């Protein structure tokens, strides 16, 4: 089994504000489905109003760092047998959230 990070950029969800309850329910339905399938590890949204903090070479600096056009808006971590399975779950998340999702394999699992 391999873990994957599925994420979207903050600001990529461009649906009308009145659609938010329906989008949230659709996203929660996918999470419930992933939990029932035993593939859900963790997920959540990133609060964009919080300043980031960066730790480098033993020191900590207030951010945000670096200047960037895209910031992660939310993510899911799943554990599935194959890349194709990860892509299938990413497609379900994309459909429910109405925005593109990026899929990345997690190379290091501290539990292994």
Locations of regions flagged by a protein language model:
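Conserved, structured core segments of small domains
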Residues: 1-112
């Amino acid at each position: 089994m391999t873990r994957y990070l599925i994420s979207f950029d903050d600001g990529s969800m461009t649906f009308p504000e009145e659609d938010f309850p329906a989008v949230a329910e659709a996203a929660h339905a996918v999470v419930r489905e992933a939990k029932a399938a035993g593939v859900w590890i963790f997920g959540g949204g990133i609060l964009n109003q919080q300043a980031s903090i960066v730790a480098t070479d033993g020191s900590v600096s207030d951010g945000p760092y670096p200047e960037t056009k895209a910031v992660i808006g939310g993510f899911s971590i799943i554990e599935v047998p194959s890349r194709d399975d990860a892509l299938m779950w990413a497609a379900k998340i994309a459909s429910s959230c109405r925005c593109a999702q990026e899929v990345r394999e997690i190379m290091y699992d501290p539990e292994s």
